[in-house]
């Protein structure tokens, strides 16, 4: 592998790790309604598990309410069952056409749990990024042994991989801090 290939692969994988974290963080409840809380809930319908966002439009008509409008009215019971099973602490109100979810404000204890969950997710993302760094460094060493790059190129590649790692970890920290701030605000 060339230096450019190693760097491109590492950057791509690190960006993916950051985007997975951001996706996971969007599913963490804050004090206000957010479609991200429910859009990835899997609903068993038509014999398979389907993400809710493919079965219904999801909106927030009020700051404390999520409104779910199924595209097919026959799926409303399945959607309601999946929300209850999703263990979000939200009680769906089904009027036959739409499902309303009232998002209660978070208590202090729940906020602390959410913040600790955010920190866990951020740490998992950092571990993933460090593993990607290790793989990239190993690829650079292998390329040097196979005479595909010089020792100087290997060292330069390792330095660039470290820069990518710092950038990705900064993105992880910023995403986690922003979500923590959202959880802690009233």
UniProtKB/Swiss-Prot annotation:
<dbReference type="GO" id="GO:0043023">
    <property type="term" value="F:ribosomal large subunit binding"/>
</dbReference>
<protein>
    <recommendedName>
        <fullName>Ribosome-recycling factor</fullName>
    </recommendedName>
</protein>
<feature type="compositionally biased region" description="Basic and acidic residues">
    <location>
        <begin position="134"/>
        <end position="169"/>
    </location>
</feature>
<dbReference type="InterPro" id="IPR036191">
    <property type="entry name" value="RRF_sf"/>
</dbReference>
<dbReference type="GO" id="GO:0006412">
    <property type="term" value="P:translation"/>
</dbReference>
<keyword id="KW-0963">Cytoplasm</keyword>
<dbReference type="Pfam" id="PF01765">
    <property type="entry name" value="RRF"/>
</dbReference>
<dbReference type="GO" id="GO:0006415">
    <property type="term" value="P:translational termination"/>
</dbReference>
<feature type="compositionally biased region" description="Basic and acidic residues">
    <location>
        <begin position="176"/>
        <end position="186"/>
    </location>
</feature>
<feature type="region of interest" description="Disordered">
    <location>
        <begin position="134"/>
        <end position="186"/>
    </location>
</feature>
<dbReference type="InterPro" id="IPR023584">
    <property type="entry name" value="Ribosome_recyc_fac_dom"/>
</dbReference>
<keyword id="KW-0648">Protein biosynthesis</keyword>
<comment type="function">
    <text>Responsible for the release of ribosomes from messenger RNA at the termination of protein biosynthesis. May increase the efficiency of translation by recycling ribosomes from one round of translation to another.</text>
</comment>
<dbReference type="GO" id="GO:0005737">
    <property type="term" value="C:cytoplasm"/>
</dbReference>
<dbReference type="InterPro" id="IPR002661">
    <property type="entry name" value="Ribosome_recyc_fac"/>
</dbReference>
<comment type="similarity">
    <text>Belongs to the RRF family.</text>
</comment>
């Amino acid at each position: 592998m060339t230096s450019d290939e190693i760097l491109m692969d590492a950057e791509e994988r690190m960006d993916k790790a950051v985007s997975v974290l951001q996706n996971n963080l969007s599913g963490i409840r804050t004090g206000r309604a957010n479609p991200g809380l429910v859009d990835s809930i899997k609903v068993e319908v038509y014999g398979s598990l389907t993400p809710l966002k493919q079965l219904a439009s999801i909106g927030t008509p009020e700051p404390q309410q999520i409104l779910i409008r199924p595209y097919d009215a026959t799926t409303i019971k399945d959607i309601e069952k999946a929300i209850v099973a999703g263990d979000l602490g939200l009680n769906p109100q089904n009027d036959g056409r739409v499902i309303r979810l009232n998002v209660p404000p978070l208590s202090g204890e729940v906020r602390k749990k959410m913040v600790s969950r955010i920190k866990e997710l951020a740490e998992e993302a950092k571990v993933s990024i460090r593993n990607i760094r290790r793989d990239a460094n190993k690829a650079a060493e292998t390329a040097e042994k196979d005479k595909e790059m010089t020792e100087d190129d290997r060292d330069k590649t390792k330095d660039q991989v470290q820069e990518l790692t710092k950038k990705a970890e900064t993105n992880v920290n910023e995403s986690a801090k922003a979500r923590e701030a959202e959880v802690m605000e009233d």
